[in-house]
Regions:
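Bacterial N-terminal signal peptides that target proteins for export
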Residues: 1-11
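Bacterial N-terminal signal peptides
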Residues: 9-19
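Periplasmic c-type cytochrome electron-transfer domains
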Residues: 3, 22-520
Length: 520
């Protein structure tokens, strides 16, 4: 797309951005100062800083992620909420809705000017709420809470399944006979695979995942491996902004192996990695890699959904959920072996401390410090311990849920297989279904068929008390606005003047910055 007015080249960043710059979703304080001091406190050029850089380059994304990681998370959130302008590259791609949509579904995407436009409820929080016409019947944008946990679980499952495959090949070659092994990871059965002595594979019994055994946790049909690909694709397809110089996707998409700043391994020799989009015809690369780095790191560390009121009714509802067979696919808990995050936030119903929305968050840091002797701030690196992800409710498998869930593709084919959508947050993400066609939880459950027919029928046969308890349980799995939710980092203070507009508490992470007075 074309930039409408003068553009400046940001020194050292290798990217064009407008010198006039930027309004945020709630305003950019550097462009529209206000007495309330509400909005984003840094300009877009300040957020880009010294570009990608390295751990020895102050102001670069790599430096901040490794030495001031909570600032990097907050900066990623501010970029997520930023309302990008046409002067910054936002706007229609050159095709502008014209072309062969059978082969390029992005023609029907966007246009948005902010990540929070599609992932906006509640209050720009990375939640659900946007319909995009990437399919004839549209897609309802899912929420992004716990996105990093999903990426890590899917990647570890992939590693397990491929290790089983490789072991089967080795045994077949050793014994000179075919070897069949079950594909199981984190308690989930992905079928079986048979290896032949010549190294060939029979993958006809692989279930719920591609035959290359790569679990793709993003999008309804399971089509994307990593947060980084997701971010770069959304910037281009939904916002018309090209991160064409992204070094990680450039290398991995051409067969290389890279580790992103968030610790995700992208290996083009094993997986098909989406390349970054081509440069804009007029303006070239429009998104500095530093922007992608901060967005990726923010989403890796983004908070998981909350639990609202838990009582005897929700306890009974959880038992009904298990009894009806829902938990055979919507598996509640899984364990990450190597957690790449630097913090975890547990948010629960607490009307005493959560005086504004009855939720209160407890933050726990998950990093260690290392002085590298450089004179810079110490490195703050992920501990990499195991972590139990509770109440995610998915199996990371694709399933055929029957004709009620099928969707049309532009080329006339039908999409029949969909990932089991995690149920955390489901109480605040209606309407339901990948297409947003089901208005209530009751509707979307009764819509199930195919592999879920038995569970659907068991649900339909529930007596009213069991039904009400089950729905109460599901409705207790909620999303929340972090900037309006009190926490151990920023507790509520009802004595503040003009409470609750002031003093309601938040999970802004500012107190964990190296310099908490330097606001993002």
């Amino acid at each position: 797309m074309r930039l409408l007015e003068r553009v400046l080249s940001f020194a050292g960043a290798g990217v064009l951005f407008v010198g006039l710059a930027s309004q945020a979703q709630m305003i950019d304080n550097t462009q529209a100062p206000n007495t309330a001091k509400a909005g984003i406190n840094k300009s877009l050029l300040d957020e880009i800083g010294a570009g990608r850089g390295d751990v020895m380059t102050p102001g670069s994304s790599i430096f901040i992620i490794n030495r001031d990681p909570f600032r990097a998370i907050r900066r990623g959130r501010q970029l997520f909420q930023r309302k990008f302008t046409r002067l910054q590259g936002q706007g229609a791609n050159e095709k502008d809705g014209v072309g062969d949509i059978n082969n390029d579904i992005a023609i029907g995407a966007g246009l948005s000017d902010s990540c929070a436009l599609c992932h906006g409820r509640p209050r720009g929080s990375g939640g659900a709420g946007g319909n995009v016409v990437t399919r004839p019947d549209s897609r309802d944008a899912g929420h992004l809470f716990g996105l990093g946990l999903k990426e890590m679980l899917a990647d570890e499952i992939t590693t397990d399944l491929r290790a089983t495959r490789d072991l089967a090949i080795a045994k077949a070659q050793q014994t000179k006979h075919p070897v069949t092994m079950k594909l199981v990871s984190k308690g989930v059965n992905y079928g079986s695979i048979t290896a032949n002595p010549d190294g060939s594979l029979d993958t006809s019994k692989v279930a719920g995942v591609d035959t290359d055994l790569r679990v793709k946790p993003f999008f309804a049909e399971g089509s994307t491996i990593s947060i980084r690909e997701f971010v770069v694709g959304a910037l281009h397809n939904e916002m018309g902004m090209e991160a064409s110089a992204d070094p990680d996707l450039l290398a991995a998409s051409t067969g290389g192996r890279v580790v992103t700043p968030s610790g995700m391994v992208l290996d083009g020799s094993k997986d098909k990695i989406s390349p970054p989009p081509a440069p804009d015809d007029q303006n070239g690369n429009e998104v500095d890699p530093a922007i992608v780095d901060h967005l990726e790191f923010y989403l890796l560390n983004y908070f998981k959904p909350a639990h609202y009121i838990q009582n005897s009714s929700t306890d009974r509802g959880r038992a009904v959920f298990n009894k009806t067979g829902c938990s055979s696919c919507h598996i509640p808990d899984m364990t990450i072996n190597h957690d790449r995050r630097v913090a975890d936030v547990e948010t629960v119903y607490d009307p005493v401390n959560g005086v504004f929305n009855s939720l209160f968050a407890t933050a726990s840091t998950l990093y260690y410090t290392k002085d590298d002797g450089s004179g810079n701030p110490v490195l703050k690196l992920p501990l990499g311990n195991s972590f139990v992800v509770r109440d995610i409710f998915t199996d990371f498998k694709r399933h055929d849920l029957g004709a009620n869930f099928y969707e049309r593709n532009w080329d006339g084919t039908m999409q029949t297989m969909f990932l089991t959508r995690p149920l955390w947050g489901v109480g605040t993400t209606g309407p339901y279904g990948h297409d947003g066609r089901s208005i209530t939880l009751n509707d979307v459950i009764l819509r199930h068929g195919g592999e879920a027919q038995a569970a659907r029928d068991a649900f339909a046969a529930l007596k009213s008390n069991d039904l009400n308890n089950l729905l109460a349980f599901l409705n207790s799995l909620v999303l929340f606005p972090p900037d309006d939710t009190a926490s151990t980092l920023d507790p509520a203070d009802p004595s503040k003047l003009n409470f609750p507009q002031f003093g309601h508490g938040s999970i802004k992470l500012t107190v964990l910055f190296n310099d908490p007075t330097d606001l993002e």
